[in-house]
């Protein structure tokens, strides 16, 4: 799982795809093809009536699906700024612009810390064998305990049998 995450990060970093942003003056920003697909899939998933436009509730749900906990005021501002019809809808191209900008603005360290919290569901501040087992099961990964223990051992710098947040950050930043 950790090795896959590092490999995935490397492949993302090495294969950016340009995206155009901004209201009337497009900016050139780099996102990966996978990120672009995630944005498109989120839009299509939450465009419940398939009219190529999403309303407030659909926009908020799509943003959450992409990992953004948007407040009501932020969602309303996006609709005000990008709704060309004045009917409270966001077109797909504008959704792609907004989400691309938000993805580019993400703080990688905050994203890693959020990922750590997903592993550390018991809030101990560490990723245990039990935590890894649960995540592997949720991801439908068939990894036996011996392999999971080897993963912990490889990255457990303080040799306490678990991965703490700093060790996890080092793994994800490729410093381990």
Curated annotation (Swiss-Prot):
Q: Where can this protein be found?
A: Nucleus
> Where does the chain bind Ca(2+) 1?
47, 49, 51, 58
Q: CDD domains from the entry?
A: EFh (cd00051)
Query: What GO terms in the biological process aspect are recorded for it?
Result: cell division; meiotic spindle pole body organization; microtubule cytoskeleton organization; mitotic spindle pole body duplication; proteasome-mediated ubiquitin-dependent protein catabolic process; spindle pole body duplication
Where does the UniProt entry say this protein principally localizes? nucleus
Keywords from the UniProt entry: Calcium, Cell cycle, Cell division, Metal-binding, Mitosis, Nucleus, Repeat
CC per GO annotation = cytosol; half bridge of mitotic spindle pole body; half bridge of spindle pole body; meiotic spindle pole body; mitotic spindle pole body; nucleus
Whether Cell cycle counts among this entry's keywords is yes
- Annotated EF-hand domain ranges read 34-69, 70-105, 107-142, 143-176
* Segments of skewed composition (Basic residues): 1-12
Q: Where is the signal peptide?
A: none
Asked if the record carries the keyword Iron, the reply is no
Q: Which family does it belong to?
A: Belongs to the centrin family.
What is the annotated role of this protein in its UniProt record? Required for the proper coordination between exit from mitosis and the initiation of septation. Has a role in bipolar spindle formation during spindle pole body (SPB) duplication. Required for the localization of sad1 to the SPB.
Quaternary structure and partners: Component of the spindle pole body (SPB), acting as the connector of microtubule arrays in the cytoplasm and the nucleoplasm, is involved in nuclear positioning before chromosome segregation, SPB separation, spindle formation, chromosome segregation, nuclear migration into the bud, nuclear reorientation after cytokinesis and nuclear fusion during conjugation. The SPB half-bridge, which is tightly associated with the cytoplasmic side of the nuclear envelope and the SPB, is playing a key role as the starting structure for and in the initiation of SPB duplication in G1.
Matching entries from PANTHER family are given as: CENTRIN 3 (PTHR23048:SF48), MYOSIN LIGHT CHAIN 1, 3 (PTHR23048)
Specify the protein name. Cell division control protein 31
